[in-house]
């Protein structure tokens, strides 16, 4: 069984949105005044690219909300999640912006702030309140603020509740300003990204890729911008990417887990060999500790294949694999003292 440990937050949604908005017409602007991208400008160019994708979707000076969970029939990138719904906005800090994070009670909601150098100038926030961002505090003229809010993807009523929560996110700013970025040369940017991804493929630990300027390693941060722009520290979200040994689609697996040391929540999402959710008649794609069925002892048993009448059942196919997402993991997970149990062939 292969297991990879990574940390992540907004890379997937960033890639998703860029894929949705990209087109030959906007992919490369006019050749006049192209600004070449080198190793020392790559992070800024990459941030500007993603910021522009959010702006193009209507998220400039205000928040653009993803109103539904990941659609099974329209997955634009691999290994998307159906645990949370996203809200995001890009702001010109020529004038300060104040953002109100609503009180969501026991429901998980995070607010992440990323500047143009892909640093997190303030910690990921989970508490309700008002937060004022200035250019002095953030460090760059533009900033991206992203929310992710827990949602039960199989419950239309819960999705409506999340939509109402999204509408409670408020923005106050004297002037929205303008969005003005260099005309980065996409060809040199693509070449630089490809080269950095070759180096990034040798990384076994992403813990120094994302965070504040003081927390990251400069080289790891550069590589992180290439393979997963917008990732946040492992202390906020840690993923385990697992491929079972006998993932032939015929051998059922199971795992039992109890008392997972997270302050947020955990989930398991199952993908096919291409990394996508594979449509099934059970509408079963992921399990989490909020909506999953507990055993009498408080543990959860996840069934991969086998009897579809079992609780917490996920259908499997040839080449299947899964990701465990751990939101706000406690120190014993980060230290490796507690490990999420792996799925084993069912007895």
Where are these regions (language model features)?
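Positively charged n-region of N-terminal signal peptides that target proteins for export
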Residues: 1-4
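Bacterial N-terminal signal peptides
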Residues: 9-19
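Signal peptide processing junction and immediate N-terminal pro/mature segment
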Residues: 19-27
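A compositional/structural signature for long, glycine/proline-rich flexible linkers
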Residues: 27-347
């Amino acid at each position: 069984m292969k297991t990879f440990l990574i940390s992540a937050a907004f890379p997937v949604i960033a890639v998703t949105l860029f894929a949705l908005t990209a087109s030959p017409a906007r992919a490369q602007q006019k050749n006049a005044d192209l600004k070449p991208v080198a190793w020392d400008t790559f992070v800024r160019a990459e941030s500007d690219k993603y910021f522009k994708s959010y702006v193009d979707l209507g998220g400039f000076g205000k928040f653009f909300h993803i109103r539904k969970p990941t659609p099974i029939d329209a997955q634009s990138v691999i290994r998307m999640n159906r645990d949370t719904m996203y809200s995001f906005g890009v702001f010109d800090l020529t004038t300060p912006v104040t953002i109100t994070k609503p009180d969501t009670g026991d429901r998980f909601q995070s607010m992440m702030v990323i500047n143009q150098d892909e640093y997190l100038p303030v910690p990921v926030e989970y508490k309700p309140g008002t937060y004022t961002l200035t250019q002095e505090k953030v460090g760059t003229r533009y900033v991206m603020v992203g929310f992710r809010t827990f949602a039960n993807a199989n419950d239309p009523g819960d999705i409506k509740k999340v939509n109402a929560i999204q509408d409670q996110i408020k923005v106050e700013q004297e002037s929205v300003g303008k969005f003005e970025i260099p005309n980065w040369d996409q060809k040199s940017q693509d070449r630089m990204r490809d080269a950095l991804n070759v180096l990034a493929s040798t990384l076994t630990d992403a813990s120094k890729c994302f965070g504040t300027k003081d927390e990251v390693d400069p080289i790891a941060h550069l590589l992180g911008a290439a393979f997963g722009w917008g990732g946040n520290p492992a202390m906020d979200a840690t993923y385990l990417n697992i491929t079972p040994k006998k993932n032939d689609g015929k051998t059922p697996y199971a795992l039992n887990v109890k008392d997972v040391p997270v302050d947020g929540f955990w989930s398991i999402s199952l993908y096919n060999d291409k990394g996508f959710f594979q449509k099934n008649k059970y509408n079963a794609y992921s399990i989490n500790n909020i909506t999953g069925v507990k055993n009498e002892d408080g543990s959860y048993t996840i069934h991969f294949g086998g009897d579809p009448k079992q609780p917490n059942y996920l259908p499997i196919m040839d080449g299947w694999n899964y990701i465990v997402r751990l939101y706000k993991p406690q120190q014993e997970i980060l230290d490796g003292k507690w490990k999420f149990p792996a799925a084993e062939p069912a007895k």
